[in-house]
Amino acid sequence: MTAFLNDFSKFYGTGEKNEAGQNLEEFLELYDSRKYETPSNTTDAVIFAYEGESCDSIDGLKVLLVKRSNHPSIGYWALPGGFANMRENLDETARRELEEETGVKGLVMEQIATYGDYDRDPRTRVITTAYMAVVPENAVKVQAGDDAADAVWCEVNLQGVSTEERENDLKCYGGAVSDLEKQMEYHYKLHVKNVSRGLDTEAEVVQTICGELVREEHFQVEKAGEIAVDHSAIIVQAILTLKKRL
């Protein structure tokens, strides 16, 4: 099989042959990527908008959502995003999908998280990389396109509900939690609203943190409302990330 890259000169290593007696060219010629089942990769973008001259608080923020016109989660609201092309870097995917679905382009975008639970998509194994951007609301024009039935700014409000401390939870660190480690659970309600579109929904998300110096952090959707898949968890993580910087 032809190598995926035309120029693979930086992959020679020491130039020695492998145990099968193959040099790099021979190895690539026989390598069959179809032999292994592999995940698909997507990006999703959390685009926040603020009013006024600067973004000083998470209060009053809006988030850009698209309405899905096809399965899965048809009719629900989602973050703009989609599948990465084979010869496209993830940053390029995030910008392309954002422009195709909403018409928004030219933003500074930061990669904030990866979501890879095996059961997050019924079509196939899909791992998504989440991006975040913040813009003045009047600086961009939103117009739905591609497979988005609609694209709008939505009011978003995050409310902390409760905090729980647990010890020796076997879910943390794959069941190898030290007696000294604590597991903290933070419960949130995410309210998303757009009056003109008849959208008024609430999601419940749990943030779990294990460890201190090295932290294992997860965001899990307990109740999705009308927000597709795990996108409410991604939005909550983005809001909390932004809140730390304001």
Locate the predicted segments by residue:
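N-terminal leader/linker segments that precede catalytic domains of diphosphate-processing enzymes
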Residues: 1-246
